[in-house]
Amino acid sequence: MQSDSAPLPRVEYVFETSKFRMTSRANEARLRLTNECPILVRPHEPFIMPTGIHFTRTPSCAFILTGETDKDVFCHTGLIDGGYRGEIQVILLNKRKYPVTLYRGELNICLSAFNYVLPPLRDVSFLTPPMYANDAGFDVMVMHSMVIPPTTDQPFMIYLGVETPGPPEPHVALALGRSGLASRGIVIDVSEWGPRGLQLKFYNYSGQPWLAQPGSRICQIVFVERRHILKGFKKCLRHRKLAPGVRFREARVHFREDTNSVRKHTHEDNPVHEPNVATASADIRGTKGLGSSGF
């Protein structure tokens, strides 16, 4: 455990946008953004909103992207891998049959760091290991075809009656949605994989049935340090509620704006610290995907 006197791990970023304003307090252990302009979210049309945030330096951790609004809009809880260097984007989905507008100040975005482990798993047929260096999630694949109908009021539920295959204490296996599916209208509630199995709650806001073929990746599993998931008396500590029963407390890191890397407004300029596509190693994520899983 890190002592209070030790310097905090540093996360450096650049922030270039007029669509959000930074609302984090000084020395806050997370980044907070609030929308500056109206956002129109139409039914059955996932809205991918650039935040203007690019990480240029990250310690050995990953990040969770969360969104909050009082409107009838589902904000995809995104996994941002430590090796991702593209622009971080939030995915919004309309839960109703009519357009919903988020006016100035009605959408709050948070980026929080967490520590994780990649355990050597025993043979689990429906889990595949991370694809890139510094990726945090194991993909969950379906073994048989299934159809997720359009969501009305109730989620489409899948139960995997398999004990969590990861290490025991001090880690918790969390199921998170894939950004590639969220960009097509398919999202899940964050859930904990326990000794009795894993329950997945899917929401299909695309307006069309979605067919998952055998081998399709439907979500991802992250083995999070247990101290990030508050239980018992610790639930009284400050936290973010990722889902009913899942109370998340971020890692203590120092977010600092990278003044040495200034993102230009012109499309001709090379993005900050992003690997050149022609020379980047195949095992580096770089700008691929939306932070974790890709399209």
Swiss-Prot record:
Q: What class of enzyme is it?
A: hydrolase
Q: Which residues bind substrate?
A: 178-180
Q: Does the keyword Protease apply?
A: no
Hey, which family's this protein in?
Belongs to the dUTPase family.
EC assignment: the record states 3.6.1.23
Q: What ranges does the record list as Basic and acidic residues composition bias?
A: 260-272
> One GO BP annotation here?
dUTP metabolic process
Query: Does the record carry Hydrolase as a key word?
Result: yes
Segments for region (Disordered)? 260-295
Q: What is this protein called?
A: Deoxyuridine 5'-triphosphate nucleotidohydrolase
GO MF terms listed in the record are:
dUTP diphosphatase activity; metal ion binding
Q: Which residues form a coiled coil?
A: none
User: Which keywords fit this entry according to its UniProt record?
Assistant: Hydrolase, Magnesium, Metal-binding, Nucleotide metabolism
CC cofactor:
Mg(2+)
